[in-house]
């Protein structure tokens, strides 16, 4: 039983809300929308609201009012495009970082140090964040982009970037899915955090930090910081500039 005023919503992080609505009775379609909370929802402020062509505007208005006033969240309204806004941008960034990590021969722990608090982001950086999210989940998000974007699909100038990185494919094949399975880009052994060596697919001692010189660069005002990174020759600085 569903009350005639009840709102039906999906928490999908990127599947088409319009396509999901096609399985619903016509009477429910006007009350159906997407409401994407970010994990862990207890702490993450952002919520995406996504309508379909048949969603009544009042449904989104009422949901936004409730989510902001009762739950204290910050709402953005997203179009019904693959992975909406945050995951579309976020996964593109992660894939670019994986590619540049390989190109500059950097290790995952160093890159996490560079892309974490030093850039004003979460201390987990890139690869630790991927482990927490789940590498299988990450792969599903990537596949949503692969299935829906491209020259013969929805145009996206960055669609060539959405290939599955070989290291991710190998981790998925070995069932090392991140934190949920105890191993991914990192693996905890006793009290030690080991990091993956992508060449051997074995875990080695981790905990390396970025070069102190690069760390000092990132503390400079924005203009000076960019100038220093542009002129620097080290792999870590070139990685950040890339």
Regions from the language model: what does each represent?
Residues 1-242:
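N-terminal glycine-rich phosphate-binding loop for ADP-containing cofactors
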């Amino acid at each position: 039983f569903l009350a005639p005023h009840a709102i039906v919503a999906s928490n999908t992080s990127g599947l088409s809300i319009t396509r999901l609505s096609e399985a619903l009775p016509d009477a429910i379609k006007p009350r159906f929308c997407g409401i994407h909370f970010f994990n862990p929802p207890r702490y993450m402020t952002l919520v995406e609201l996504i309508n379909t062509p048949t969603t009544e505007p009042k449904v989104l208005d009422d949901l936004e009012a409730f989510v902001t006033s009762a739950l204290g969240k910050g709402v953005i309204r997203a179009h019904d495009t693959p992975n909406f806004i945050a995951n579309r941008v976020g996964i593109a960034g992660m894939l670019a970082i994986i590619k540049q990590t390989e190109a500059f021969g950097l290790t995952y722990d160093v890159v996490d140090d560079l892309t974490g608090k030093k850039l004003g982001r979460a201390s987990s950086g890139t690869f630790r964040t991927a482990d927490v999210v789940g590498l299988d989940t990450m792969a599903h998000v990537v596949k949503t982009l692969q299935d829906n974007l491209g020259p013969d699909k929805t145009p996206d100038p960055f669609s060539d970037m959405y290939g599955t990185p070989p290291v991710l494919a190998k981790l998925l094949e070995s069932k090392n899915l991140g934190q949920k399975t105890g191993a991914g880009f990192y693996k905890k052994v006793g009290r030690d955090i080991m990091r993956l060596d992508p060449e051997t697919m074995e875990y080695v001692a981790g905990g390396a930090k970025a070069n102190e010189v690069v760390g000092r660069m990132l503390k400079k005002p924005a203009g000076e910081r960019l100038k220093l990174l542009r002129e620097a020759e080290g792999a870590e600085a070139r990685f950040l500039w890339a």
